[in-house]
Curated annotation (Swiss-Prot):
Modified sites of kind Phosphothreonine: 148
Protein name: Jun dimerization protein 2
Post-translational modification as stated in the protein's UniProt record: Phosphorylation of Thr-148 by MAPK8 in response to different stress conditions such as, UV irradiation, oxidatives stress and anisomycin treatments. Polyubiquitinated; probably by IRF2BP1.
Region of interest: Basic motif: 74-96
Span list, region Disordered: 1-20, 58-89
Organism domain of life: Eukaryota
Keyword Transcription regulation: yes
Family: Belongs to the bZIP family. ATF subfamily.
Region called Leucine-zipper, residue ranges: 100-128
Compartments (UniProt record): Nucleus
Species, as recorded: Homo sapiens
UniProt crosslink position (Glycyl lysine isopeptide (Lys-Gly) (interchain with G-Cter in SUMO2)): 65
Amino acid sequence: MMPGQIPDPSVTTGSLPGLGPLTGLPSSALTVEELKYADIRNLGAMIAPLHFLEVKLGKRPQPVKSELDEEEERRKRRREKNKVAAARCRNKKKERTEFLQRESERLELMNAELKTQIEELKQERQQLILMLNRHRPTCIVRTDSVKTPESEGNPLLEQLEKK
């Protein structure tokens, strides 16, 4: 018999096989008054064979209501803390993403400005070379001592020209 089940009224001490009247006690149902005066030895002998039927004499200890409430309260607090932490994590991630997006846009603008500046400097260089080449025939300085940018072996200028 499982705890919480109602005992079968058809099962009595006299109907159990091999038990018969238990150690001198009558097979009829015992009253509280009769149990008070019964010999403890006889009572123990009567109760012991009933263990195979899973008869539970005591109540199973149930958790106290306040313990259940405390456990539920702890769960609620833990869930609330987790919810707050998750929101904080999402906000930090969102802020980080927005920061990286702004930084990316700023760097792209800077890159575009630098490319524009490179193009302007290339054009200015070409104009200066052209002016120098136009001026050379009229210049009285010896051409042996002056090197023009075309004849110089400047690796930086060569790299810029290749681009």
